[in-house]
């Protein structure tokens, strides 16, 4: 059973109502297949996995009249690969982007008088897929011991390719355009 808040509702209503009255209840389906390959030989270790999946939501009476729509985290393709040799490691990730709510269309609205404003049109729920996420990380683990203590030093670089991996879509009112927000560019670890 899945839930969505009804428009304008909040759980912080002082206990005056049951929380179930503030949400729409619906269903969801998730299908997929995953393949994993693992290799180990002496100092070498490698692992690769691929997932093909589809996740949808439906049956919410107040959301698209119960029609099916993409789940926010419906990522059709996910590929992960890791290779380690002695203390060095490489990790690669490639996956489909999240689904977001976007209003790609606008139209002018007129009121009585001279006031005019622009309205955004949302054609559906989770109607825009964000770009693919691509990341390559490098790392090195150095182990050493002193007389009584074992030490481990880990150094690395996160997102070596400095790929712009957006995770959120928002509307910038100053430029009146949709913008993507990404965190963590190339970063020492």
Report residues per predicted region.
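Asparagine-centered polar/low-complexity signal
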Residues: 23-24, 80, 126, 159-165
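C-terminal beta-signal and adjacent terminal beta-strands/loops
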Residues: 1, 93-116, 131-135, 141-189
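Active-site rim elements
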Residues: 67-69, 122-128, 177-179
